[in-house]
Structure formats: structure tokens, C-alpha cells
UniProtKB/Swiss-Prot annotation:
The keyword Calcium does not apply. HAMAP family: RNase_Z_BN. Pfam families: Lactamase_B. It catalyses: Endonucleolytic cleavage of RNA, removing extra 3' nucleotides from tRNA precursor, generating 3' termini of tRNAs. A 3'-hydroxy group is left at the tRNA terminus and a 5'-phosphoryl group is left at the trailer molecule. The keyword Zinc applies. Keywords: Endonuclease, Hydrolase, Metal-binding, Nuclease, tRNA processing, Zinc. Homodimer. Binds 2 Zn(2+) ions. Zn(2+) 1 binds at residues 63, 65, 145, 216. GO terms for molecular function: 3'-tRNA processing endoribonuclease activity; zinc ion binding. This is Ribonuclease Z.
């Protein structure tokens, strides 16, 4: 499992940073990739990666500002050409209006998609758990931006314990169907009368990962709730320390506000994105240092960067 950032800039494309998009690679877990936001030029960014567009099966949109959605119709159209014979449907989750935005573009341009798009729209009254699979759950909660905007909390369900095959062999259990029974939690009685207690040979379940990905937002308690105990928090940092009033006026956060959210939520790692083009390299270093005075494990991400979870 890993996150790859396709665009880490704010507002409009810049030389060093494209606008918002990232993917959560779940290839080992689901053989899928989930995309979060799809700003202008996202499909061009994908060409610089190993991502196969047909593997992108779910797309989560935080809000309908252009720097988060204008790349979506183009990506969906190009995906049809890049999928070859292995066409896979796409589920799109997002605020009410995302279906109209996408379908108006598709119909007006005459694009033909050889796969189906399944839209899952919501408003402020219909949030909470928006998706559950056998391995993951996704929650959405309203943030505090200039338009309706959400953050997402991706929760991996706990992983089953693993079977200690060597310990079983040492206990005298021959390899075969009985191994499967023990793995499934069933006790087994050997020919000599010895009882193999399954739980003694299976490790404890492993806690699943929690990934929180926020859209644009002012500092708000909703961010803390979404991020509580997360392994990774992806938080915007459009402004820097000292610009709190400006950030609030425009519906955004500063680096230090993001750090306070991370600290309050007891997350393990904070990844800052949505970085304004006005910040130069020395500004970025200072932004990181200022945030680290509040929360230690802070990293300001770059376009195409991958973070393993």
C-alpha cells in the first residue's frame, strides 16, 4: 500500500507542481488504485508513473473547484483508449454536481466510453460511511471551505493472523488438509490424542492502516475527527505561519494549523500538500521547520513522490 502524489500545487498549474490529485495504490490488497481528486493535467502526470489507468477503479472527489476536478473528463476519456480489451468500470464518489459536470463534458464532446461510470453523490446530510468492501471502509465528513468540501478517512479492516507452519510441524501435524482447518480457527485432534488448539498457532490479527485525505479546509474539528489515530494525514498547506487570517478568509489552512490538527488527532505522519506556487525552496524548508515545532513527523510532498504505508 502506498500513496503517490500526482499534483501537489494550489489553485493553478505551476512549473514545479501540478494541481490536486493523488492515488492510493492498493494493488496487493485489491489489485486496484483509488484516485483522490483529479485536477487539470492529471492524466499527463500519470504518464510519468507506472500507473495503469484501467487499475483506477474508484475516484473520490473532495469538492468541485476546478483545480480538483477539471482533469476528470479528460482522464475518463483517455482511459477508454488506454484500457485495451480489459475494460473496467469506475465508481466516482463526490458532492452533488459531480455527475452533471462529468456527463455534460462527455456528451458535449461526443466521447465514447466502453465502460460504465457509477456515480455516488452526497450532500452534507448524507455523509458518514460511504463505502464498505470486504477489506476497506471509507468515511466522509464535511470540512470548512468556501464551497461544500469533504475529507475522506480510509480504514483498512484488521488483517487476519498468520499461521505458524513451522510450529505446527514441530507439534507433529502433517502438512495437508489439517493445516487448512487450523488456519480457519478449528482445533484438530492428532492420532495420538493430542489436541492442536488453533489459536496457539495463529498470530494475533494485525491492525489495519488508516489514511486520512482532506480537501481544502480551514482549521476545523472535523479534520481532527477524520484524522484521529491515522497512520497518515494528508492535509493542505496553502498558506504559511503568520497568514492565518488570510487562510481563513480564503477557506484554507497554514502549515502550523495543519500540524496542530495532526497533533490533536495523534496521527503518526503528516504529509503537507496543496502548496502555493509563490513558495520557493527556502520557503518550503521554513514551512516544514515551523510545522515540526508543533508536530515532529512532517513532510512536504512533491509531485510524483511515493510514500509507502
Amino acid at each position: 500500500m502506498e500513496i503517490q502524489f500526482l499534483g501537489t500545487g494550489a489553485g493553478q498549474p505551476a512549473k514545479a507542481r501540478n494541481v490536486s490529485s493523488l492515488v492510493l495504490k492498493l494493488l496487493d490488497e485489491l489489485n486496484e488504485i483509488w484516485m483522490f481528486d483529479c485536477g487539470e493535467g492529471t492524466q499527463r502526470q500519470i504518464l510519468e508513473t507506472t500507473i495503469k489507468p484501467r487499475k483506477i477503479r474508484k475516484i473520490f472527489i473532495t469538492h468541485l473547484h476546478g483545480d480538483h476536478v477539471f482533469g476528470l473528463p479528460g482522464f475518463l476519456s483517455s482511459r477508454a483508449f488506454q484500457a485495451n480489451d480489459e475494460q473496467t468500470d469506475v465508481d466516482i464518489y463526490g458532492p452533488v454536481g459531480i455527475k452533471h459536470l462529468v456527463m455534460a463534458s462527455i456528451r458535449t464532446s461526443g466521447a465514447h466510453l466502453p465502460y460504465h461510470i457509477h456515480f455516488h453523490e452526497f450532500d452534507a446530510k448524507h455523509l458518514g460511511k460511504i463505502l464498505e468492501t470486504d477489506k476497506f471502509m471509507v468515511y466522509a465528513e464535511k470540512l470548512d471551505h468556501t464551497i461544500f468540501c469533504v475529507g475522506y478517512r480510509v480504514v483498512q479492516k484488521d488483517l487476519e493472523g498468520t499461521l505458524d507452519a513451522e510450529k505446527l510441524k514441530a507439534a507433529g501435524l502433517p502438512f495437508g488438509p489439517l493445516f487448512g482447518r487450523v488456519k480457519n480457527g478449528q482445533d484438530v485432534v492428532l492420532e495420538d490424542g493430542t489436541t492442536i488448539i488453533a489459536k496457539d498457532y495463529i498470530s494475533a490479527p494485525k491492525k489495519g492502516k488508516v489514511i486520512t485525505i482532506l480537501g481544502d479546509t480551514r482549521k476545523t474539528d472535523a479534520s481532527i475527527r477524520l484524522a484521529l489515530g491515522a497512520d497518515v494525514l494528508v492535509h493542505e498547506s496553502t498558506y504559511s505561519k503568520g497568514d492565518e487570517n488570510l487562510a481563513r478568509r480564503h477557506g484554507h489552512s497554514t502549515n502550523t494549523e495543519a500540524a496542530r490538527v495532526a497533533k490533536a488527532a495523534s496521527v503518526k505522519k503528516l504529509l503537507l500538500n496543496h502548496i502555493s506556487a509563490r513558495f520557493l525552496s527556502h520557503d518550503i524548508s521554513r514551512m516544514r521547520d515551523d510545522a515540526q515545532e508543533i508536530f515532529t513527523d512532517v513532510h512536504i510532498v512533491r509531485d510524483l513522490e511515493e510514500v509507502k504505508l
